[in-house]
């Protein structure tokens, strides 16, 4: 499609002119263009985002963010901008980030390292004590009386029991710290899942008929119709170029005609 090729060239030219972008997008970024018709009448605020490509109109988009921003002039914005500094997402993301920091700090803490050293030493000491007494029993085997043999066997059991208790106490110190870390990991997972679900409910997709629904509902309906096990949308659903372009067109009474996505920058590995 000549119009799509022309739109793609305009995007490449625009990217090259945005020098602040190049260090980031040079590593690789997905861009997209959508040819649209204005049959339904176009709201005036859409005009800055419509690009004239010589007889046709096009919308431009990029996936995700560029320099931490979901919107740059000339490109359609994210379907739902969740990156406001003081917004719900950022506040809860900060809590998850803090949990990551605490988990990492505990994993590298001197308390955990000391507890693990104590456990290793307890195991080594226990092994030495048991083997030392076994060697003693072996030396005494030829000359000991029945009563001495009974005592020595009982003493060996007592030594093993004390050794096991010592190792168990040291293991408990390690386990206590690991349990705290697991508790933080569980909290992190729950918070992450809850935040992802919140994002899915806030992220509303608009159909060509103008019906807007949370993407969580869209995936749930698809799962019911098809028997799919994919009840939750994959992370990042709706952040790609095509959903952004189509959603913007559907929301602003623009009729999609043709779409193309293309890669700019280094090839993905």
Regions found by a protein language model. Give the residues of each.
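Catalytic cores of nucleic-acid editing and processing enzymes
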Residues: 1-269
């Amino acid at each position: 499609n000549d119009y799509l090729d022309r739109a793609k060239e305009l995007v490449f030219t625009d990217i090259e002119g945005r020098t602040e972008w190049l260090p980031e997008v040079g590593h690789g970024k997905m861009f997209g263009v959508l040819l649209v018709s204005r049959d339904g009448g176009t709201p005036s605020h859409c005009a800055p985002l419509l690009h004239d490509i010589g007889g046709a109109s096009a919308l431009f988009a990029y996936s995700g963010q560029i320099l931490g921003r979901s919107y740059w002039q000339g490109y359609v914005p994210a379907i739902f901008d969740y990156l406001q500094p003081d917004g719900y997402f950022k506040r809860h993301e900060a809590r998850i980030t803090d949990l990551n920091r605490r988990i990492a700090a505990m994993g590298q803490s001197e308390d955990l390292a000391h507890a693990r050293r104590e456990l290793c030493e307890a195991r080594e000491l226990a092994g030495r004590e048991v083997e030392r007494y076994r060697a003693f029993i072996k030396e005494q085997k030829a000359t000991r009386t029945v009563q001495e043999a009974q005592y020595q066997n009982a003493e060996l059991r007592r030594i093993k029991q004390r050794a096991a208790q010592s190792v168990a106490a040291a293991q408990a110190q390690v386990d206590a710290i690991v349990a705290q870390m697991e508790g933080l990991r569980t909290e992190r997972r729950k918070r992450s899942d809850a935040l992802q679900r919140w994002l899915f409910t806030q992220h509303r997709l608009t159909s060509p008929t103008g019906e807007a629904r949370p993407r969580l509902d869209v995936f749930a309906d698809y799962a019911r119709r098809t028997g799919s096990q994919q009840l939750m949308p994959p992370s990042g659903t709706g952040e790609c170029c095509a959903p952004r372009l189509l959603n913007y067109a559907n929301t602003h009474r623009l009729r999609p005609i043709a779409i193309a996505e293309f890669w700019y920058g280094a090839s993905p590995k």
